[in-house]
Amino acid sequence: MATKENLQEAFAGESQANRKYLAFADKAEADGFPQIARLFRAAAAAETVHAHAHLRVMGEVKSVAENLQAAIDGEGLEFKSMYPDFVAQAEKEGNKGAVMSFKNALAVEQIHYGLYSDALKVLNSGKDMPEAKIFVCSVCGNTVLNGAPDKCPICHSPKEKFFEV
């Protein structure tokens, strides 16, 4: 395997390990093991360092405009083709949990696509986005500017499920 493919595989593995370890940390914390949770969070942070290093070596961290366009392209692919295909397969198999997870992600990726597109338009005018508080739904990932809604329009969770980034 060529070095480029090794870097891509390493980036994917480190990224997945980061997310998995953060989920493990949440579980350890919830079960009353704060030091084990801290260990998982530390390892997750280390995996992020590795993933970012691999991404930089691959030349994938570019200008802000190029990074926004890459995010737009990725989110577009996810909500236009990837998640619809995943939803269809999960429905065919009768996996209701996967259907809900995929539908939530599809809806949120479309929102991210719009947010990134708006940010790129503003950036292309030579400015940063206007200052805003950004909130994320802890259930579905819905991302909103300037305050959490009373009820998430995607998963219908209450306002209390949103956290500020």
Kindly label every feature range from the protein language model.
Residues M1-V165:
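Non-heme di-metal
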